[in-house]
Amino acid sequence: MSDTWYTPGTAALSNVLIVGDHASNHVPPGIELGIDQAVLDTHIGWDIGVAALAWALGAPAWLGHVSRLVIDLNREPGDAALVPLASDGHEIPGNAADTSDRISLYWQPYHDGLARHIALTAPAMLVSLHSFTPRLTTRPEEQRPWEVGVLYNRDERAPRLAIPRLEAAGIVTGDQQPYSGKLLNASMNRHAEAIGIPYLGLEVRQDLIDTEAGVARWAARLGPIIAEVCASIA
């Protein structure tokens, strides 16, 4: 628990558990990534706005407390990008050394703790909460018009309920955009699909939730939809 944040949430979404693998850009003492703090503060270091949005939604939340550049909690051991050597055009020189201890120090406690928490609390649905940059430095020509993306792998129960509701609310919605849950879904594969818990993978565009006002607006828009999807599945 020392490297995760847990907040119990409020009654509004008490039967949902938000999981935010990339909610922090914290680099623990003793780790030298070899990059400036200014880089860590961008989308390269974390999912901007996710922690604030999780708190604003009021659901119980399990949030990673180390930067994705220290270790990517949404990948499995053995994945070449678990400890990235580069991200969106920026080399991470400190990750060229032996980093195998980061699995036992950060990855394993995060996932073991999450598994125990799910077993103890039995949430009706998980919400995998991420955010995405409007534009990648390495692909400036790529258009990312979506306000919210919905990601999933094999279990489509929650996505099929959520997508039409998001669209009906006037939200520009990407189905498996800007990433595909068929490729990037490690935490939900492990903690939801493997044990049959419904889940909703959400990617929110970062420029919409990088201010307090933006967070409040999108919590108000997404909260009722999440609650309705969860109730419809139950």
Describe every region a protein language model picked out.
Residues 1-234:
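N-terminal catalytic or cofactor-binding beta/alpha core of small enzyme domains
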